[in-house]
Swiss-Prot record:
This protein's record includes keyword Iron-sulfur: no
Native organism: Photobacterium phosphoreum
Transmembrane segment boundaries: none
Pfam families recorded: Lum_binding (PF00677)
Repeat positions for Lumazine-binding: 1-96, 97-189
Function summary: Antenna protein that modulates the color of the bioluminescence emission of the luciferase. In the presence of LumP, luciferase emission is shifted to higher energy values (shorter wavelength).
SUPFAM superfamilies according to UniProt: Riboflavin synthase domain-like
Chain's gene name: luxL
Record's protein name: Lumazine protein
Keyword Repeat assigned: yes
Amino acid sequence: MFKGIVQGVGIIKKISKNDDTQRHGITFPKDILDSVEKDTVMLVNGCSVTVVRITGDVVYFDIDQAINTTTFRKLEVGNKVNLEVRPGFGSLLGKGALTGNIKGVATVDNITEEEDLLKVYIKIPKDLIENISSEDHIGINGVSNSIEEVSNDIICINYPKNLSITTNLGTLETGSEVNVETLNVSNEW
């Protein structure tokens, strides 16, 4: 389990593609780099991945099954990704905890500003929307958010403008795709 609180933003430095697998090399901020080693399990844009290699400040992950079910298939060199290292045993997680099991990809429908908040309207795939209600939590690119409202297949989340600096949420625009982790039918992550 993860807290759903982004610890830093990495930048895609290299993508190697094979038939069924991609290896992503991500430049890590120093403060997070010091807490990872080979076999560390962590979230990259909300998706649980395992470190396979570290060279300098570049951390490598193999992406296989997640290529077709996440935004990894569209990432390019230079893109920013949210990073979170799994908390230690016994850490408090809070009610917005994430598993790293991405349920689908959603599309940003609209973004508006209100004082110090950004309101992001996200079009959720039909197979996921039926299990979502306002005031639930949802993971968007690894950031745990409360849902303010649900209207048809559109949800609205709010986040403070400072999160647009400390996460990759600031790069979102209408049409952007995001990884989504939702509650399942039994209301568990």
